Amino acid sequence: MAKKILGYIKLQVPAGAATPSPPIGPALGQRGVNIMGFCKEFNARTEKEQKGTPLPTVITVYQDKSFTFVTKTPPATYYIKQAVGLQSGSGKTGRETVGKITRAQLREIAEKKMKDLNANDVEAAARIIEGSARSMGLQIVEA
């Protein structure tokens, strides 16, 4: 018989840097999950990723306080900031442009994010990423 699910916890955890401090500790502690067990397992699984890369993680907590987790690809904004070399997006989206990004760069990001996006093909995924770039205050150029 399958284990009964107690709940889900969604966190954005830096790759290879899970520690019992907030926000991880309190979120897992409320559900009675072994915090150090999660941190060790997460850090072991994300060894190959670049240290500090934010990874959206969904933790499934079962009634017997055991857990499983799934990591997803880093957020589109992380890839966009890396491609353009930004620290943060525009504070005045639509009025202030902070940089430029090419369609080729958008397509490359879309290919990396494809499995986590709700899109049927790379073109649709690129349009989703383009929307994120525009909302960060970036100008999309053809070259």
From Swiss-Prot:
InterPro entries in the record: Ribosomal_uL11, Ribosomal_uL11_bac-typ, Ribosomal_uL11_C, Ribosomal_uL11_C_sf, Ribosomal_uL11_CS, Ribosomal_uL11_N, Ribosomal_uL11_N_sf
Any Pfam family the entry gives: Ribosomal_L11
Keyword flag Transferase: no
GO MF term set: large ribosomal subunit rRNA binding; structural constituent of ribosome
PROSITE patterns per the UniProt record, alphabetical: RIBOSOMAL_L11
UniProt PTM: One or more lysine residues are methylated.
Membrane-spanning parts: none
Keywords from the UniProt entry: Methylation, Ribonucleoprotein, Ribosomal protein, RNA-binding, rRNA-binding
Record-level GO cellular component terms: cytosolic large ribosomal subunit
GO biological process: translation
HAMAP family xref list: Ribosomal_uL11 (MF_00736)
Family: Belongs to the universal ribosomal protein uL11 family.
Role of this protein: Forms part of the ribosomal stalk which helps the ribosome interact with GTP-bound translation factors.
Subunit details: Part of the ribosomal stalk of the 50S ribosomal subunit. Interacts with L10 and the large rRNA to form the base of the stalk. L10 forms an elongated spine to which L12 dimers bind in a sequential fashion forming a multimeric L10(L12)X complex.
Protein name: Large ribosomal subunit protein uL11
Originating organism: Phenylobacterium zucineum (strain HLK1)
Native organism taxonomy: Bacteria, Pseudomonadati, Pseudomonadota, Alphaproteobacteria, Caulobacterales
